[in-house]
C-alpha cells in the first residue's frame, strides 16, 4: 500500500533525513478490537514481529488496547517489531493504547530496528502509552524505539506516562530514536513522569529532531533524564517551532553531572543548535539540573518568542552551585534571544548549593568564549532579566548589538531590554551577586531601550549607543565597561526610583578608556507618580549621576551635560518646577547633584474632581424637573381640589471636554402634592419630592446623592381684555376675549452628597457635602381654542417664561491619605424659555394629549467652580465643570387620562438638548380629585 506522504510532511528543514527514511510501499496488516489484549487474567500476549523490506503498515479498524502484556513473565520481544523495513500504524480515527508492558530488555510498545527505517503513528484520535515499560522493568529500554525516524503526525490526543529506560546505557524513557518528528497533532500531547538512566527522560534523538505545527498544548512534566535533558535529550541540531503552547515543569537531570533540567542539546565534538520559535506560549517552570542549565543546556540556542515566554523558578546545583539557573550555553556556544510577538521573562531562577549562599539568582550562564548573538525585542515587546546573567572569565570579542534586525526581516526591533533587581526578596537583596550581570562582550545599542532598574549593575567589555536609542537608568544602577570605552548619545534617568543618596553610575575600568555623553540628561517618570510625590512640594537636592574613569577625570567628556544638564521636561501633571545642577570633580570622577525648585501644581485628571461643581448642575436638573411636573399637574383635566403622587426618573449626561471628564447624573424618586382651585379659577399647588441619585465622571469618581425638594405653584387666569392695550377696532375686541394664563413657582432643594474617589495609585478617598438650591419661575401663556372638529390640536398655548436657579455647594474636606479640601461654590442661571404647548382633547373631554416645544436662552450665568487643595501639601487648583451651552431646545409630550370622575392618570416625557449635554426625564402619576 502506498503511504500518503503529505501526512508526514513537517515544517522544519531539519527533518529532511526523516522523510527520506519513510518507505513508499509496505504490506498492510489489520488491527481490530479483537486484537486487543488484557493480561490481568493470566493470558499471554504474543509479540508481533515482521521482516518486510517494503515495511509493514498496521491499519486499525476499531479501538485497540494492550494491557498487562508480559505480566508475570516478560515478553520475548517488543509488542510490535519490524526488523527490515519501516513500521507504520495508521489509526483511521481510532484509539490505540498500551498500559503496563514488560518486554524485558526490549522496547515496550513498538520498534523499528533497521538503520534509517522509520516508526510512524498517524491518524489516531488517541494514543496512550502508560508504564510500557514501567519502573519495575529493570532492563527496560523505552516505549518506542527507532533506528531511523520516529514520526507522530496528524493525531489527536497523545499521552506518554510513567515509561522508563532503566538499562544503564539507554537513552529516552518514552522515545529513543535517530530522528524525530512530532507534527500536525491537534489535541494535547503530554509526557509525564517518564525517566531514563541517561539522556532524555521523555525523548531522546541522536540526530535531527522537530516538534512543530501542533495545535494542542504540549506538556512535559516531572520527567527525569539522569545525565541530561529531563524531558528532551538531543545530540544534533533540533527545532521546536510553530506550536500552540508548550509547558515544561518539574523535569530534572539528577546525575552528579546532570545538565539541562528540561532540554539538553549538546554533543562532544559537535556544535548542535536548538531552535525554539513561533510558539504562541512557552513556559519553563521549576525544572532543575545539577551542573548546568536548570531548564536548558545547549551548545547553541536560538529562541524567538511568538507569545509570552517565561522562565520561572528553575534551578541548577546541588551540594555546589551549578551554572545557569535557567539556561546554560556551552563553551564557544551561542545564544540568540528575540522577543518578536511576546515578552521573554526570567524570574526566580537560581543557583543552589548546601553552603552559603544557598541560593543565588541567575538566568543565564555563558561558557568560555560563548557569546550572545542577538538580544532584541520588537516594538512593544520586552525581555525582562529579573535574574542576572553570568559569564565565564573568557569572553568573546564579537560585538553584541542590542535590537539589531535581520537584513531580511520586516520587524522593527525597538523594544526594551530590562535588567532589574526589583523583584528580589529582602534577603536576596543583601547579596551583590543577585544584582550583577556580566557579559564579556562589547555592547552596542542600535535601537529601542536598554533599561537598568532596581539597583542592578551591568558589566560589559565596552558600550556604544546609536542615535535614537535610549539608555534608561534608575538611581542606584551602574553601567561598567571593563576593557573598552563608553559612548552615550541619550541617557534617561528614571525618577520613579529616586531615593536616599543613590546615583546613576557610569564607569570605565580600562586604562585611559573614555566616557562620552553628547546630550543633556533626560528625566523620565516611568511610574507616572514622581511629580505627584509630596516630597517634591519643597525644594530638595539629590546626588544624581557619577561618571568615573579608571585613569583621570580628563577621560570624561560630558560638555553637553555641563552646558545644559537636563532637557526641558515634557509637560506633566503634579508639582511643577525645574532642575538646577551643580558639579563636583575629583581626580577620576565627575559628579552631578540636582536641585529641584518647585513653582506650582497641575493636578492630574484623577485629582481634579470636577464632579463636585458638576453636582450643582445635577441639582439644577432635579429642581427643574420638579417644576415641569408641577406645571403639568396644573394642566390636569379636572382643576378642582385634589391630591396627587408621581414617580419620576431623570438622566443628565454631558460629554468630555478639554480637561473635564464626562459627567453623568441619574436620579429617581417620588413626588406627592396637593392642588386647589378657588372660585376665580386660580390654582394653588404644593408638592414635596425625594430623589435618590448617582453621579459619575465615567472615570474614577462616584457620588451618591439624596435630594429633598419642595415647590409652591400659583396660577391665575385672566383675559387680555383686562389689560391696557391700544385700540385696533374689531381686532382689539377679538383679542380681549383671549384667555391669559399667568403662573409663578417657587422651589427649594436640599441635596446630601457622598463621594468616593477610587484612585488607581493611591488609597480611596471619601467626602460628603450638601447643596442648597432655589428656583423661581414666572410665566404667561395665551389660550387659543379651536372647535372640537378641528384636525390635529384644539388648544394652542404660546408661552413666555422667566426662570432663575441658584445652587450653592458647601465647603468640605475629604478623609483619606490623599484627601482634598474643597471651598464652596455656586451656580446661577437665568433663562427665558419661549415656545408653544399644543393640546388634543378627546371628544368626551375626558382625555387629552399635549406636546410642548420651546427654545431656551440663558441670559445670565455664573458657572460653578470650586477651589480645591491637597490637605497633605497645600497645593491647590480650581475644579471647573463644563460650561453648558447657553441655548437649549426642550421638547415634551404628556397625557392626562380620566379613569373616573375623581381619578386621573398622567404621564410625561421630556428631552432637553444643550450642545453636548442631554437631559431626559419621565414621570407617571395618579391624581385624586374631590
From Swiss-Prot:
What sequence ranges are listed for the domain Autotransporter? Answer: 636-930
Q: Which domain of life is it from?
A: Bacteria
Q: How does it sit in the membrane?
A: Peripheral membrane protein
Q: Where mainly located?
A: secreted
> SMART domains from the xrefs?
Autotransporter
Stored Gene3D superfamilies = Autotransporter beta-domain
Q: Which SUPFAM superfamilies match?
A: Autotransporter
Q: Where does the protein end up?
A: Secreted, Cell wall; Cell outer membrane
GO CC list: cell outer membrane; extracellular region
Q: Please state the span of the N-terminal signal peptide per the UniProt entry.
A: 1-26
Q: Which InterPro entries match?
A: Autotransporte_beta (IPR005546), Autotransporte_beta_dom_sf (IPR036709), Polymorphic_membr_middle (IPR011427), POMP_repeat (IPR003368)
The protein's matches in Pfam families, at most eight in alphabetical order, are given as: Chlam_PMP, ChlamPMP_M
Keyword vocabulary terms for this entry: Cell outer membrane, Cell wall, Membrane, Secreted, Signal, Transmembrane, Transmembrane beta strand
The record lists the effect of residue 177 to A as:
In strain: AR39, J138 and TW-183
Q: Which NCBIfam families match?
A: POMP_repeat
Q: Which family does it belong to?
A: Belongs to the PMP outer membrane protein family.
List the protein's name. Answer: Probable outer membrane protein pmp8
Q: Which organism is it from?
A: Chlamydia pneumoniae
Q: What is the lineage of its organism?
A: Bacteria, Pseudomonadati, Chlamydiota, Chlamydiia, Chlamydiales
Q: Which gene encodes it?
A: pmp8
